[in-house]
């Protein structure tokens, strides 16, 4: 028997291995791969990761096994031509132009935005030159240069997103960072939010166009349910109180008062439609060409608790500790003295708490002016305090059109709301407050008043000659309601119980956190701390 030595076995293994490797002209990356990627000016970023990482010494050895009629560049041309022929059967002329070696990335716009091409090895291996070679119709060896220039243009898209992180400098991104880039999928039916040069179209938003008015001159209110626009199950005929600036609801049906609980506020948001209010240009030109009203969508959630009062705040389970760290010296002392003197608890009062926070930037005079206005407001008969919208509708049920009252807003982000009658319906709109000015619209700084009382009195004077504004739904073909404030509904016309009046006075002059220290029975303390006074 013939003995096979270990040397003979190794020689036969090397021969078989060299035969297999003659079909491929690139090998696994070696230590020279990093040097080829760094020097972009020599190779023009034309070659892929596999070509740039070839070992020169090993190529010299493999040259012995290569056929004499086939060179390295000839093999590359043959592979490129075969690849282009395969792609050309199912693609267009534009895709054929971008076809190149398998080490490059696809050139479609959809693929560039997708997560996979971002994590691909081509983006990590190619080194993009800040001044790429000019495009010109040449041989297939330079096709990869055209592809890289197109990929760079696609990556430099103007729309925001994680893909734009690649356009800063690809050489600074590590492979791990490229794997972490996950662009969110974008729907095809609309344009994503983009920079000021891009087109942004939202197909589901239908803002009506009115002759003589612009789309920004609108305010929202909810659509009345009895018109069939916003149906709810059961006998209810009122829209829920949401964060839209203008809201509409019908008069409660007899015997259906028990259905108007605060728990009903948790409904699907698609049941609430955001409408607008527009100003008649022939009566009042406050809004025409001067305001830029933002259309707000209803807020995502509602509180189970009834609305709170900025004048008589209830107890808060989790009070937020507020301080005036932005002030020092006499300003800090003045802010603290104002807060104590006004008997306000900023931790529990809705809307007022954010005003106290603004002291750090605007100074304590903002809080002082707001407090003085609220004190003047408390003396007005048409101010009813923290009543709900359902209670306001009950008080406005049997009164003529033009009747109104002012109440505390049920939204924590706002102070007050106006409830008024128009065409047999009760509408609700908020009173905006910004920098010490009040208005029914979303830009108090432009057409607002420095006093709430002045705002109401000015609206009453404008209503003497007719409606000073109109409310209308955003839905096409919806009804339009004229807005007039002619008959204030005063709370002084109703005499409440002595117990109610005592609680009203105590809550007006006693901070909520000091009620437990009063020398009163526990039952009386609990009654004083109830959310309605």
UniProtKB/Swiss-Prot annotation:
Gene3D superfamilies: SH2 domain, SOCS box. Keywords: Growth regulation, SH2 domain, Signal transduction inhibitor, Ubl conjugation pathway. Residues 76-88 have a biased composition (Basic residues). This is Suppressor of cytokine signaling 6. Interacts with KIT (phosphorylated). Interacts with RBCK1. Interacts with phosphorylated IRS4. Interacts with PIM3. One of its GO terms (cellular component) is cytosol. Residues 382-489 form the SH2 domain.
């Amino acid at each position: 028997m013939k003995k096979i030595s270990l040397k003979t076995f190794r020689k036969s293994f090397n021969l078989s291995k060299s035969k297999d490797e003659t079909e491929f002209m690139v090998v696994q990356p070696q230590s020279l791969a990093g040097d080829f990627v760094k020097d972009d000016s020599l190779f023009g970023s034309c070659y892929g990761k596999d070509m740039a990482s070839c070992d020169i010494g090993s190529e010299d050895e493999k040259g012995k096994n290569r056929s004499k009629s086939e060179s390295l560049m000839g093999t590359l041309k043959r592979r490129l031509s075969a690849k282009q022929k395969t792609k050309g059967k199912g693609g267009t002329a534009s895709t054929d132009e971008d076809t190149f070696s398998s080490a490059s990335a696809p050139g479609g716009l959809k693929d560039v935005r997708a997560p996979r091409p971002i994590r691909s090895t081509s983006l990590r291996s190619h080194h993009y030159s800040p001044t790429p070679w000019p495009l010109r119709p040449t041989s297939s060896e330079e096709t990869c240069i055209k592809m890289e220039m197109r990929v760079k243009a696609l990556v430099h898209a103007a729309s925001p997103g994680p893909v734009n992180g690649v356009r800063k400098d690809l050489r600074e991104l590590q492979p791990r960072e490229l794997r972490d880039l996950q662009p969110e999928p974008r729907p095809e039916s609309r344009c994503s939010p983009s920079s000021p040069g891009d087109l942004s179209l939202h197909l589901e938003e239908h803002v009506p166009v009115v002759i003589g008015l612009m789309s920004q001159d609108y305010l929202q209110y909810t659509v009345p349910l009895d018109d069939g626009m916003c149906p709810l199950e059961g006998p209810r005929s009122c829209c829920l109180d949401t964060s839209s600036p203008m809201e509409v609801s019908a008069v409660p049906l007899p015997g259906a008062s028990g259905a108007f609980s605060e728990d009903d506020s948790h409904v699907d948001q698609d049941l609430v439609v955001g409408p607008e209010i527009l100003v008649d240009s022939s009566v009042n030109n406050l809004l025409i060409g001067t305001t830029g009203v933002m259309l707000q969508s209803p807020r995502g959630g509602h509180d189970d608790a009834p609305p709170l009062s900025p004048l008589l705040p209830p107890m808060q389970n989790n009070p937020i500790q507020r301080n005036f760290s932005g002030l020092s010296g006499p300003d800090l002392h003045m802010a603290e003295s104002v807060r104590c003197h006004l008997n306000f608890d900023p931790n529990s009062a809705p809307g007022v708490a954010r005003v106290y926070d603004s002291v750090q930037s605007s100074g304590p005079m903002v809080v002082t002016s707001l407090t003085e206005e609220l004190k003047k407001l408390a003396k007005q008969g048409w101010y009813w305090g923290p009543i709900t919208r359902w209670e306001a509708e009950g008080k406005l049920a049997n009164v003529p059109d033009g009747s109104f009252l002012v109440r505390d807003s049920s939204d924590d982000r706002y102070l007050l709301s106006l409830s008024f009658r128009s065409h047999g319906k009760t509408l609700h709109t908020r009173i905006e407050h910004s920098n010490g000015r009040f208005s029914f619209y979303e830009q108090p700084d432009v057409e607002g008043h420095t006093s709430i009382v002045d705002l109401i009195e000015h609206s009453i004077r404008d209503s003497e000659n007719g409606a000073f504004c109109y409310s209308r739904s955003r839905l096409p073909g919806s009804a339009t309601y004229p807005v007039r404030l002619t008959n204030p509904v005063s709370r002084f016309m109703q005499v409440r119980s002595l117990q109610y009046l005592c609680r009203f006075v105590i809550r007006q002059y006693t901070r909520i956190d000091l009620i437990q220290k009063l020398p009163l029975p526990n039952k009386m303390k609990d009654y004083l701390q109830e959310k309605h006074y």
